[in-house]
């Protein structure tokens, strides 16, 4: 594994140092990705979520696993290899549940986990309660892969989650009663949707070179996003709510400013493949973009994305996630030999005066 920085990288005081958790020894928690776990080429690699600098959730086989870096222990949270059925009754919930669900994406926030499947399945679970609370099939379409899920708080503080699906639909669910609140349809499969920090706008990207900015209430297109030349797989808002990023199969991540959408601010280039996942730190200082395999790029946003740390390893990327406090970066790696969960810690340089204070 190597970590390479671009010109001026010595200026970056806060880089990410790594601890590798792999299959190479028998100590607890080292086999987070064993050799028979499965990632298909068309999975969009959103299978790792951090809820604190010590807690991360990820897929291993047919299980959602919680890994604690504080205690070096792993705990199975949800197993979908057999039959899963909801314990609670909600309108629209499939009481018969699902059997042998292949999870394509997941999201975790505020003690709630939502997993999406290859056939439109949605499985919701409260992390502090046993069993599953809600099961639903979003679509019976033949092309029903659940591509991405994002859990967010509305302006009124209500918890919702939004689902991007290969049937060209974007669906918004209220998590208080697990009811569908909005359903927007588009002319192409939707690979990813991101909700703006104020909840008013959506970035919609999919099997079209042109992404769109959409009003979150009406689904009306606010502006097209022109610049990519292939299909897009990822998107993310900067916490400032004015800038955002889109990742594409053309091997670039484009940065946009809503105050001038006639062209992107810049295009950041990958090395070998599509940009499959994008994450900003909660303070907006850094942005990570993931390629399908071998490379994660961490950019210093404050430098205008000029300063980059390149993380180089062996294996396919199953997901990337910053912890909410920005102190940790987790990378899921699938490989028959080197499968692992990588944890990076943010490096801080403090002056003598800072130490006294």
Residue ranges and their predicted role:
Residues 192-193, 230-239, 273-282, 317-324:
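Beta-rich, blade/repeat-based domains predominating
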Residues 1-39, 43, 55:
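Long, intrinsically disordered, low-complexity acidic/Ser/Thr/Pro-rich regions
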Residues 175, 196, 216, 238, ...:
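Short, acidic, Ser/Thr-enriched surface-loop or helix-capping motifs
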Residues 273-298:
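Loop/turn-rich, solvent-exposed surfaces of beta-rich toroidal or solenoidal domains
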């Amino acid at each position: 594994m190597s970590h390479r920085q671009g010109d001026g990288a010595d200026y970056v005081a806060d880089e990410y140092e790594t601890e590798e958790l792999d299959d190479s020894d028998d100590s607890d928690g080292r086999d987070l990705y064993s050799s028979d776990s499965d990632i298909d080429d068309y999975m969009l690699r959103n299978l790792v979520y951090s809820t604190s600098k010590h807690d991360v959730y990820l897929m291993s086989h047919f299980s959602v696993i919680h890994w604690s870096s504080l205690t070096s222990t792993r705990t199975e949270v949800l197993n979908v290899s057999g039959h899963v059925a909801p314990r609670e009754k909600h309108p629209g919930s499939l009481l018969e549940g699902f059997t042998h669900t292949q999870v394509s994406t997941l999201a975790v926030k505020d003690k709630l986990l939502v997993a999406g499947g290859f056939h439109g399945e949605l499985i919701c679970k409260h992390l502090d309660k046993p069993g599953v609370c809600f099961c639903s099939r979003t679509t019976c379409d033949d092309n029903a892969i659940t591509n991405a899920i994002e859990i967010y708080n509305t302006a009124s503080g209500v918890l919702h989650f939004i689902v991007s699906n290969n049937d060209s639909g974007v669906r918004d669910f209220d998590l208080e009663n697990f009811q569908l609140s909005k359903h927007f349809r588009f002319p192409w499969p939707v690979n990813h949707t991101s909700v703006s920090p104020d909840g008013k706008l959506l970035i919609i990207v999919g099997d079209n070179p042109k992404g769109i900015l959409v009003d979150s209430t009406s689904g009306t297109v606010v502006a097209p996003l022109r610049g990519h030349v292939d299909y897009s797989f990822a998107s993310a808002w900067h916490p400032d709510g004015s800038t955002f990023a889109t990742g594409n199969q053309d091997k670039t991540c484009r940065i946009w400013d809503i105050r001038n959408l006639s062209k992107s601010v810049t295009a950041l280039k990958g090395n070998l493949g599509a940009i499959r996942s994008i994450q900003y730190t909660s303070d907006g200082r850094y942005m990570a973009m993931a390629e399908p395999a071998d490379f994660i790029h961490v950019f210093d946003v404050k430098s205008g994305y000029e300063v980059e740390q390149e993380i180089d390893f062996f294996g396919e990327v199953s997901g990337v996630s910053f912890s909410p406090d920005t102190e940790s970066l987790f990378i899921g790696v699938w490989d028959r030999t080197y499968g692992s969960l990588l944890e990076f810690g943010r490096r801080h340089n403090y002056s003598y005066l800072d130490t006294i204070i």
